[in-house]
Amino acid sequence: MQRDFRWLWVYEIGYAADNSRTLNVDSTAMTLPMSDPTAWATAMNNLGMAPLGIAGQPILPDFDPALGMMTGIPPITPMMPGLGIVPPPIPPDMPVVKEIIHCKSCTLFPPNPNLPPPATRERPPGCKTVFVGGLPENGTEQIIVEVFEQCGEIIAIRKSKKNFCHIRFAEEYMVDKALYLSGYRIRLGSSTDKKDTGRLHVDFAQARDDLYEWECKQRMLAREERHRRRMEEERLRPPSPPPVVHYSDHECSIVAEKLKDDSKFSEAVQTLLTWIERGEVNRRSANNFYSMIQSANSHVRRLVNEKAAHEKDMEEAKEKFKQALSGILIQFEQIVAVYHSASKQKAWDHFTKAQRKNISVWCKQAEEIRNIHNDELMGIRREEEMEMSDDEIEEMTETKETEESALVSQAEALKEENDSLRWQLDAYRNEVELLKQEQGKVHREDDPNKEQQLKLLQQALQGMQQHLLKVQEEYKKKEAELEKLKDDKLQVEKMLENLKEKESCASRLCASNQDSEYPLEKTMNSSPIKSEREALLVGIISTFLHVHPFGASIEYICSYLHRLDNKICTSDVECLMGRLQHTFKQEMTGVGASLEKRWKFCGFEGLKLT
């Protein structure tokens, strides 16, 4: 019995963002007998492949695929290497040729390959349902299943009377296979009747079930992600500390012994702290806790000694690092000196062009590395000196006025500049010493380049010294100005004390004059205005109320007076205006909640009354 194998090369075309087309090959079923070489040649010719050229000989013999298959051997497919029927890659600009698909009850004819692909709507999330339009009027649900079951498992079909239907697949990728059939012309059997033909249009469809399943899947993925993150956080979380035992005499003796041991001190002191925070200290256990606290205190000296030892080790390590860095810097200077000596015309002419280039590159690299190490060494020295200067500054206590602080900041800036110049001077001296050492090690010959470098360094050194002297002179001038300001400040303070003494004497004289002029004081006491300040206030308030003929509240008056003097009290002002009844009068304005007290100036009317 001859069995037919059904194969179909399906080319799925997906448009990427850059309008480039990617080609995927998948194999689905079509009726094609394996023993018919003519059918295979036609199919391969449609695919743009050269025929195999085997006439009258079947590509594969007739056999039962269920028989004769050994364990571990996969089924034979046209894509298997060695059969020679794997299609070559198709150029992207070449139109894709679709094939005729033969089914039991119908035939599908491909669209024109030169036409653009059919348009589709935006794909809904989790889409498993497709819309199929253009069905023949005589098409049945069985024919629809026969055509689209090649794309995958069909869960449900909803067919309408108007030549369209909705098909729901089991998986999302099956929708892409169904979209491949969009544009195909379908013919039922061999009939050419209009009711037996149609043009398929396949598009994405929205379905509540698809959206619900997609949301459930997203929630499941979110739960899995949260669970994974929680497990990761729990894995990275530090372990909980062990529980602390409750206080007892036996545990107290154990903790007291651990407190005396350096290796177990941390554990024991944590237990002691927990007991104290729990409130285990009482009159009966106070002595035990005091002895444990005393044992903990005995470790203070040990910790201080350890800190001092570590600081000493750190200083020694810093010193070793500084010495090693100085040694490395000296060796770099020697290497740079070798490069400079090789760059002289006496030796330079004997090197090739490539060798000269390499020597120049090496020299630049060595100089850069030397400068970096030199800056690092100078930075270490600068930090040490700044630490010492910071310690000196912290010991001094400065209590100066604004002008004095400005001069101090200028003096500090000059001091820092002085220090930086001193450090640069040390660096130049080190370079001069290194150059002298190089001169002693290299041949005792006249080197115009080195002499020129020495002259330049000496000139720079002299310039730095002159600049340093100028800065020191400016620093001395600023210090002299500072001292002068201090003297001026003392003189001002003395003058202020003298003025205070004179003021006290004047107040005493005024008091004696008041005692002698008692009748005058009596007349003054009888006046409603008791001082010159109150007279000034009366004048200012009168002027203010004169320009406010409808009156003003006491708060409004006081807000105006506060602009002149913040020490004016509202109650004093109101009392003063109440005493002068012929000058100011109070009226009530408004009704109910808007009731308000207003003061008015009545000096012109009071003048007539008095």
From Swiss-Prot:
Enumerate the cofactors the protein uses.
Answer: Cu cation
State how changing C602A affects the protein, per the record. Answer: Period length of activity extended to 36 minutes
Write down the EC number. Answer: 1.-.-.-
| Outcome, altering C575A | Period length of activity extended to 36 minutes
Q: Which GO terms describe its cellular component?
A: cytosol; external side of plasma membrane; extracellular region; plasma membrane
Name one molecular function that GO assigns to this entry. Answer: RNA binding
User: Where, per UniProt, does this protein localize?
Assistant: Cell membrane; Secreted, Extracellular space
Tissues expressed in: Found in the sera of cancer patients with a wide variety of cancers including breast, prostate, lung and ovarian cancers, leukemias, and lymphomas. Not found in the serum of healthy volunteers or patients with disorders other than cancer. Probably shed into serum by cancer cells. Found on the cell borders of renal, kidney and ovarian carcinomas but not on the borders of surrounding non-cancerous stromal cells.
Task: Identify this protein by name.
Answer: Ecto-NOX disulfide-thiol exchanger 2
